[in-house]
Amino acid sequence: KLFGVRLSYLPASWLEFGLTRLTQFGGRGRDQSFPGVVFDAYISEPNQTGNRDVNEQAMADFRLRIPSIPYLIPFPAGLQLYGEAGTEDKWSQLPVPSRTAFLGGLYIPQVFQGDTLDLRIEYADTDYGRRRHPELRQVWYNNSPYTSGMRYRGFPLGHHMGTDGTDLFVRTTRYLTDTLQL
């Protein structure tokens, strides 16, 4: 079973902050029920054992929308800078938990005037914690009580690269019609 909470705050039309928390609980052989186990996980000390043991992820993110500025930002719809930092299970170890992952990107919703071409460039890193602490391997999307980890049918519930990876992603798309995207 999976429970998630997301809180977004838009202090201005050009700036957004978000917090997300995912909790995996229950499953075969685990007598845990909603909402009790999730409530306990949210108010108790993290990383409890026994019937309170759950698999958790916590993330904080931002999005900065910069409007088009002639000669400086020449894109008709402006551009967006975004980022996310997350932690797996050991979220209480602030300011930078040992099991941290990062994602950062640039999105240009309209590259040329009168065209539907967009561009996204993104970098993600789920290996940062292992590089800081070599004993931490296979941390993201994995958990000892939940042997398949934070996954659905083998695929991580999060970034496609999975655990212990870095990824540079570049994508451009164009709408050929209102419903057909290339």
PLM feature segments, named:
Residues 1-150, 163-170, 175:
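Signature for the C-terminal beta-barrel architecture of outer-membrane proteins
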Residues 174, 178-182:
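Non-catalytic interaction/regulatory modules that flank or connect domains
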Residues 153-162:
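Extracellular/periplasm-exposed beta-strand and loop segments of Gram-negative cell-envelope proteins
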